[in-house]
Amino acid sequence: MDLDTASHMLTATVRTETVPMARVPWNEPGIIGRVLDAGALAVVIPMVNTADEARQAVESCRYSPVGSRSFGPSLPNNRYGSMYPVRANDEIAVIPMIETREALANLDEIVSVPGVDAVYIGPADLSIALGLPPGMDHEAAVFNDALEAVVAACHRHGVVPGVHANPSIAAKRYEQGFRMITVGYEIFAAQTALRGDGKAARAAIADAI
């Protein structure tokens, strides 16, 4: 979705108990600033491959003196008042994505960057980087060794390991040590609902014949 749509969705959460999280399209300060100004409390940043790129992501999410974020969040101010800059620096979660061989090679450096709260594996991109078909799960040792390496690095540095999954493998990922597990997205949810509705309709018609 585009930034305007994402901003409207984030705005809708401001007076709720929801903790809004946004995945931005790239590690770019202006894009990150827009979703934060709209009310995001966690930002997932794709294709972070080095410690320097992780530091850039953190700085984009933090106000001075620990970052370079520009002040302009009228909506978060409505929720948190004049203390928003202080609370934002303390509470907004910065979540780089691990999706490449380069990121795997730099794991310890990435997760040890101050301000990185979690990392999040994009399994499809990681699969491709490892020479596998895009997917959420593989039997190949190279894929499972990579997952294990991410969990181990996170545990060494007190960072939350995260991964995208689906309902059928969520328990498996939890057993592997992941503690932030997503199990769907809007297109997947719509497809699942439509399949269920179609199945129910066909069953009802069959019963009526």
Model-derived regions: residue spans:
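Expand to "…catalyze enediolate/carbanion chemistry for C-C bond making/breaking, isomerization
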Residues: 1-209
